[in-house]
């Protein structure tokens, strides 16, 4: 029965399991996400978290469903009008996935912050939508000190805005788009060198010759190249072309002197650039090794930094300046026997390296009085197979972004080289928040107010720019446009933002892929987006 349940789950979540694996799905299923405000944006975010199977969610919203809510929110109906918005949205969202547990709190976030701020610290991630500036700042401060990730999302007319607030977010499985293969042909380890030496391309049967893996072919001709060039690896375009010609000359000839059709040699020629990548430690990994948290290990140090320190010690000792072997090779034309033998050489070396890193982990844990099992073998293997792709994202706090002395002026001013850059939309959002603080409403919320609010909003924008010492010009067109928006939350923009925001939440929960740092702006007018470190 348990086996059947597992099979059904694999079928249900097949696509996403291929993306983040069983361990990523487990993290998702044990997560508890808090959504503040069941707005169109908020429910779209939750929809995209409920469908892939987050463990549970709680909606906090003290508002009642209005006619406007029923009109722009897919998860609220006319029959919901007058009910609590959190409760109504929860009921519809739970219908999407029976594996997910939902709950609601019929209270405003402001009241909870006044009476029980620690309430927000029980969640894996908090997602806040359509909050006023003052509430966002208070919430961000509470969660920052408790190291709970916060994602602020907002749909304002044709503008989408997201801000991630998280002190530190280490990522082991960053899944880079164009990861280079780890073949070590420039620095073959002894077992690999011995495997290459077992091949004699000059005295092979035709069948064996045409089914030799291209990695072996390149290694054999690289040895010949070294003997002719005093051990210098091909680097320039001309040298690589000469090296390709050298491989091409090794293709067998038929009785008429014409080259045979040997696809494995063609594959080798095609993969010269891939094979000749130098084995080195990326600068981003060097930065992690030199980080204070990697150098100063204590009992409170998170497992990521203990693993990073163990990796650093491996590089200095057993690795002889290199990271652990990844242990994977690409598919290629070869007979099964030869491919598996080559694959096993890399795999066995990867296991040996992982064991060496594991020994360093055990010593570090012992030195700080932690139990050896506090870091699992699964975590260790993940680190070693992804050691070249580790990332640490550190966001600035919202208080720093809003501080007169700590605002990132350089990022804003440099982006304003283009007067239509998406950063303008950020400045306008700050201006409408100032307008809201002064007027108790957003500009243009009623048709008759649009014209009279243009001057007021322009004044708010000017005041904001002057107060923060931002010597930039914003076109009047943007002021007019934001007044016409009337703080509306169009479902099309909310749906787009909901998908993008849910993706970031999943990255945070699974600790896979890399979150943006720290602000994302989407323009529905130009259908473009940009990220900024504010």
Curated annotation (Swiss-Prot):
Any GO MF annotation of the entry: NEDD8 activating enzyme activity
Looking up Gene3D superfamilies in the UniProt record yields: NAD(P)-binding Rossmann-like Domain
Chain spans, region Interaction with UBA3? 331-344
Which residues, renumbered to this chain, carry the PTM N-acetylalanine? Answer: 2
Relate the outcome reported for changing residue 294 to W.
In NEDFIH; uncertain significance
Indicate the impact reported for residue 430 to Q. In NEDFIH; uncertain significance
Q: Which residues cross the membrane?
A: none
UniProt KW keywords: Acetylation, Apoptosis, Cell cycle, Cell membrane, Disease variant, Intellectual disability, Membrane, Ubl conjugation, Ubl conjugation pathway
Pfam families of this UniProt entry? ThiF
**InterPro entries, alphabetized:** APP-BP1, ThiF/MoeB/HesA, ThiF_NAD_FAD-bd, Ubiquitin-activating_enz
**Protein's job:** Regulatory subunit of the dimeric UBA3-NAE1 E1 enzyme. E1 activates NEDD8 by first adenylating its C-terminal glycine residue with ATP, thereafter linking this residue to the side chain of the catalytic cysteine, yielding a NEDD8-UBA3 thioester and free AMP. E1 finally transfers NEDD8 to the catalytic cysteine of UBE2M. Necessary for cell cycle progression through the S-M checkpoint. Overexpression of NAE1 causes apoptosis through deregulation of NEDD8 conjugation.
UniProt family annotation: Belongs to the ubiquitin-activating E1 family. ULA1 subfamily.
**Protein name according to UniProt:** NEDD8-activating enzyme E1 regulatory subunit
Q: Which species is this UniProt entry from?
A: Homo sapiens
């Amino acid at each position: 029965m348990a086996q059947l349940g597992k099979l059904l789950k694999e079928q249900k979540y097949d696509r996403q399991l291929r993306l983040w694996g069983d361990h990523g799905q487990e993290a998702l299923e044990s997560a508890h996400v808090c959504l503040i405000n069941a707005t169109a944006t908020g429910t779209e975010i939750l929809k995209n978290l409920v469908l892939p199977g987050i463990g549970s969610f709680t909606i906090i919203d003290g508002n009642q469903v209005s006619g406007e809510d029923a009109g722009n929110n897919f998860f609220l109906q006319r029959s919901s009008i007058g009910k609590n918005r959190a409760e109504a949205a929860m009921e519809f969202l739970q219908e999407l996935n029976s594996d997910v547990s939902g709950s609601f709190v019929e209270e405003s976030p402001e009241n909870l912050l006044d009476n029980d701020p620690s309430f927000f610290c029980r969640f894996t991630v908090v997602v806040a939508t359509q909050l006023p500036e003052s509430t966002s700042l208070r919430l961000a401060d509470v969660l920052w000190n408790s190291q709970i990730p916060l994602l602020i999302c907002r749909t304002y007319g044709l503008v989408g805005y997201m801000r991630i607030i998280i002190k530190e977010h280490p990522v082991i499985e960053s899944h880079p788009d164009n990861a280079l293969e780890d073949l070590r042909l420039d620095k073959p380890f002894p077992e690999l060198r011995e495997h290459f030496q077992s091949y004699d391309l000059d005295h092979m049967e035709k069948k064996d010759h045409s089914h030799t893996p291209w990695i072996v072919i390149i290694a054999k001709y690289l040895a010949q190249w070294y003997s002719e060039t005093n051990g210098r690896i091909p680097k320039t375009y001309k040298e690589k072309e000469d090296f390709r010609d050298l491989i091409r000359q090794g293709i067998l000839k038929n009785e008429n002197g014409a080259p045979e059709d040997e696809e494995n040699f063609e594959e080798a020629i095609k993969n010269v650039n891939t094979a000749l990548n130098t084995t080195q430690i990326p600068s981003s990994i060097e930065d992690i090794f030199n980080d204070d948290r990697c150098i100063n290990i204590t009992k409170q140090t998170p497992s990521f930094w203990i693993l990073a320190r163990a990796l650093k010690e491996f590089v200095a000792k057993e690795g002889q300046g290199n990271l652990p072997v990844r242990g994977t090779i690409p598919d290629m034309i070869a007979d099964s026997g030869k491919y598996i033998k080559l694959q096993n050489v890399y795999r066995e070396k990867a296991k040996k390296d992982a064991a060496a890193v594991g020994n360093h982990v055990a010593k570090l844990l012992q030195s700080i009085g932690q139990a050896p099992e506090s870091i699992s073998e699964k975590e260790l293997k993940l680190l070693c197979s992804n050691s070249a792709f580790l990332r640490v994202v550190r966001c600035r706090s919202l208080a720093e972004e809003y501080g007169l002395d700590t605002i990132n002026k350089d990022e804003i001013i440099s982006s304003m080289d283009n007067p239509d850059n998406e950063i303008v939309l950020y400045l306008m959002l700050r201006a409408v928040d100032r307008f809201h603080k002064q007027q108790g409403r957003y500009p243009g919320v009623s048709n008759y107010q649009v014209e009279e609010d243009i001057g007021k909003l322009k004044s708010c924008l000017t005041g904001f720019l002057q107060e923060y010492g931002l010597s930039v010009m914003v076109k009047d067109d943007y002021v007019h446009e934001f007044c016409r928006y009337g703080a509306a939350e169009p479902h099309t923009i909310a749906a787009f933002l909901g998908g993008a925001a849910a993706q970031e939440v999943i990255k945070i929960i699974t600790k896979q892929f890399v979150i943006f740092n720290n602000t994302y702006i989407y323009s529905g007018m130009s259908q473009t987006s940009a990220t900024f470190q504010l």
